[in-house]
Structures are given as structure tokens and as C-alpha cells.
Regions:
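Long, low-complexity, Lys/Arg-enriched
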Residues: 1-93, 114-359
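Contiguous, well-ordered alpha-helical segments that form the cores/surfaces of helical PPI scaffolds
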Residues: 103-112
Length: 359
């Protein structure tokens, strides 16, 4: 194991340790990146595109989402923390947040657990679709803490790709259960171990990138040592990672935990969600001649991030008047993408983006 300095991004020391190697790589234009991905010449995790600065309109929508969602975040973070504390008893909890979407939730859970008197550790680690989890980062965590207290954290589920990566990555590593202990805020796909809800809702940190995730980029694949990331210094004036967690902590500390209903997450409900998700993805793939389900991005957060980072072809919403998809609709229209209202055809999802086939 190579020695490394503690790396916390723009978070406060103690909130998270990113097990990532800061790197500098040449930026790839979004259109060029799409061609390289779809041609198979490069994997998406070999490249980064410059993350654009959020517009004032984007920032306003983020703050509006936080104003509307902070109390819900506080309540659901507390419910998740209570559930984890109950399941692990006196055993220390080791949160391994999946970069980037899992990190804000991981920080909030870490703070909540510590405020409850639980021993908690928090790391940010890379997981990459089709390539798996960062084994070097897991080696570090396992060497320090063992495996019995490790919980993986992500913000939400889309169509279950990352859950599949976790299953494949952990099956040959001793000490992990058959079903990965994956905790999420929202699980419309029904594939997590523990979730606060199955709603596809406007999670504030789901519609912002580096500014709300410690000012780091997506992770970059490395075949040796820790995976990499870039520090997004060009976005430092928009940094809101600490503001988000501080806002949620403010509301969380007003709650009476004993008054909150325990989370009820049962396997039958999850099974129905999973099957409905499969049906929606299959319908869209058939209807719009999508040759790879990787091009289908279901859920408000995934659909919005796809429009921000990729080359979209179609954007579908359950209702065009749904205020939770306002940012997605606006971004799509800026790019000249037609937004189609689909009603109940989208199942549990309120939005889906399909990436354009460029080859």
C-alpha cells in the first residue's frame, strides 16, 4: 500500500477522507468524448470534460431545491443513521461513499452518527461502471477497519448499474455479505440494502456536480494504485458542499429522533420496483431503438446530469409542469432537445434522458 496524504477536497477535515489521487489530465470535448465512448476507443473513465460553471439560473434552482428539500433531507438522514446504529449496535460504522454522488449523503450520515455517539469513519472511494470498485482504496479501508462495519453509500439509484458493479466487485473479496450493504437516500430502482424512500425526487445535491461534492471531478481509472480525480479549482467560487451539509445539520438538530418513524424497507416492495424498472428500460430501449442500456439514464438526478455532461437525444418527463424537473427541462431546451411528456409510461421515474447515438 502506497502512503498518501489525507485528501478532503473542500470538505472540513474529519468529514471525509477521499481515497483518490489528485491528477491533472487534458480535457476532452463533450462531443469528442461521446464519439470515443461509443466507438469503444476509450472508456468514459479514461477521460474528463471541463465541468462548466453553473449559470445563475442553475444556482437559483439549486438553492430553491435546498430550501424545499432541507427538512426532508434532515429527517431522512436521521432515519438512515438511526437504522444503521440499530443494525450495527456497538460496532463502529465505516461509511464508504461512492464518488461523487454518494459523498454529500455520506458526510451528512457521518455527522449524524457521531452526534448520536456512534463511532463512525467516512471515506470517498471510486467505483466505475464496467470496471468495478477501486480495489486499492478498499485495501486501505479493510487494513484499517476490517470488513464487518463497512457500508457503501450512494445518493440514489437509477437503473441499478452501480449495485451490479458492487456485487461483482465484492463477491471474490472475503468478509462481505452476498447483498452489498448499499445505503441510499432514494431507491426508485429497488436495488439497495437500505433506503430512506423509493421516491424519484429533486435531491438538491443530485443536480449539481463538483461544487456540491467537495470540488472534485468524476473519478479517473487507474490500473495501479488509487483511482484519480481532478480538483475543480475553476469552480471554487461556486463551492457549496459545506453549505449544504451545514444547512441540513441545522434542521437535523431541531428534530426529536425518537418521534421519527423507523424506516420500512422490505424485499417484496423492492422486487416490484426492480421489475418495473426493468420494464421501463426495456420499453424505452425498444421504442427508441437504443442498442445499449448504458445510454438510458432514468431518474431526475441521472437524467439531469446526463444533459449536463453528455450529448442527449431524448428527454422524457412524467409531467412537463412538475417543478422538480424544471432544471432538466430548461437545460434540454437550451441544447435544442425536445422534451416529451410521457405520463405513467415512465413507471416510478419522473424523468429519463437517452444519450444520443453519435456513430
Amino acid at each position: 500500500m502506497q502512503p498518501h496524504d489525507t485528501f478532503t477536497g473542500s470538505y472540513q477535515p474529519g468529514d471525509v477522507e477521499f481515497l483518490l489521487k489528485p491528477v491533472v489530465i487534458e480535457m476532452t470535448l463533450v462531443e469528442q468524448k461521446e464519439e470515443l465512448i461509443q466507438s469503444g476507443k476509450k472508456h468514459y473513465s479514461d477521460m474528463l470534460s471541463q465541468e462548466p460553471a453553473p449559470t445563475q439560473w442553475h444556482l437559483d434552482l439549486f438553492h430553491r431545491a435546498l430550501d424545499r428539500g432541507a427538512e426532508r433531507l434532515a429527517k431522512e438522514v436521521t432515519q438512515l443513521a438511526i437504522a444503521l446504529a440499530k443494525r450495527f449496535g456497538d460496532e463502529p460504522i465505516v461509511l464508504a461513499s461512492l464518488v461523487r454522488a454518494g459523498v454529500p449523503l455520506g458526510v451528512m450520515l457521518h455527522q449524524a452518527l457521531r452526534d448520536m455517539g456512534k463511532t463512525s469513519w467516512h471515506y470517498g472511494i471510486s467505483i466505475i461502471r464496467d470496471r468495478g470498485i477501486d480495489g486499492a482504496a478498499l485495501d486501505v479501508i479493510e487494513e484499517r477497519h476490517g470488513t464487518s462495519g463497512i457500508v457503501f453509500v450512494d445518493g440514489w439509484t437509477g437503473k441499478g448499474a452501480i449495485t451490479g458493479e458492487l456485487v461483482r466487485a465484492l463477491k471474490d473479496r472475503p468478509g462481505y455479505p452476498e447483498q452489498p450493504r448499499l445505503v441510499v437516500l432514494a431507491d426508485p430502482c429497488g436495488c439497495s440494502w437500505l433506503a430512506a424512500s423509493d421516491d424519484d425526487w429533486l435531491i438538491p445535491f443530485g443536480i449539481m456536480g463538483a461544487p456540491v461534492s467537495g470540488l472534485i471531478s468524476r473519478s479517473v481509472w487507474s490500473s495501479e494504485g488509487l483511482h484519480g480525480c481532478m480538483v475543480c479549482e475553476h469552480l471554487s467560487e461556486f463551492e457549496c458542499s459545506r453549505m449544504l451539509v451545514d444547512t441540513v445539520a441545522h434542521f437535523r438538530k431541531k428534530l426529536t429522533p425518537s418521534s421519527l418513524a423507523p424506516l420500512s424497507w422490505n424485499t417484496e416492495s423492492a422486487r416490484v420496483l426492480w421489475q418495473t424498472s426493468r420494464d421501463v428500460i426495456a420499453f424505452l430501449a425498444d421504442e427508441f431503438k437504443v442498442d445499449s442500456v448504458n445510454r438510458i439514464k432514468p431518474g431526475i438526478a441521472e437524467a439531469t446530469r446526463a444533459v449536463l455532461r453528455r450529448v442527449p437525444d431524448h428527454v422524457f418527463v412524467r409531467s412537463i409542469d412538475d417543478s422538480d424537473v424544471a432544471l432538466l427541462v430548461g437545460l434540454a431546451r437550451e441544447k435544442g432537445i425536445v422534451v416529451t411528456e410521457m405520463g405513467g409510461t415512465l413507471g416510478q421515474y419522473r424523468a429519463v434522458t437517452i444519450i444520443k447515438k453519435v456513430l
